[in-house]
């Protein structure tokens, strides 16, 4: 008997299957920042248009942003969060408002 692998064995040495270690991708909060110039109605419109909030939810978030300085609009994957930030900032500029939207890791 030798310690060499059996050349006649078509399957070769027994190999244990590696278990993939998958983890969830990081999520990001999309945040609106308060300013003294953007009308409250415009902020509500943005929340309805880009974050699919109903009027009541949008008003609550807008008031939170107004009183606390910033508020979370939603939590998304990185690509979705980046897209929403870009859409909101572009839309605000088109309408000549200084509203600023950012993202931060959740």
From Swiss-Prot:
GO biological process: protein catabolic process; proteolysis
Gene3D superfamilies reported in the protein's UniProt record: 3.30.1390.10
Alphabetical list of InterPro entries matching this protein: ClpS, ClpS_core, Ribosomal_bL12_C/ClpS-like
Segments of this protein annotated with the region Disordered: 1-22
UniProt function note: Involved in the modulation of the specificity of the ClpAP-mediated ATP-dependent protein degradation.
Family recorded in the similarity comment: Belongs to the ClpS family.
Subunit description: Binds to the N-terminal domain of the chaperone ClpA.
NCBIfam families in alphabetical order: PRK00033.1-2, PRK00033.1-3, PRK00033.1-5
Name the UniProt record assigns to this protein: ATP-dependent Clp protease adapter protein ClpS
Organism this protein belongs to: Halorhodospira halophila (strain DSM 244 / SL1) (Ectothiorhodospira halophila (strain DSM 244 / SL1))
Name of the gene encoding the protein in the UniProt record: clpS
């Amino acid at each position: 008997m030798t310690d060499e692998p059996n050349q006649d064995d078509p399957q070769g040495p027994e190999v244990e299957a590696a278990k993939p270690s998958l983890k969830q991708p990081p999520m990001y909060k999309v945040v609106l920042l308060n300013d003294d110039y953007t009308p409250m109605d415009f902020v509500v419109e943005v929340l309805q248009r880009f974050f699919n909030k109903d009027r009541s939810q949008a008003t609550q978030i807008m008031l939170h942003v107004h009183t606390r300085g910033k508020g979370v609009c939603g939590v998304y994957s990185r690509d979705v969060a980046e897209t929403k930030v870009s859409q909101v900032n572009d839309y605000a500029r088109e309408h000549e408002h200084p509203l600023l939207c950012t993202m931060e890791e959740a």
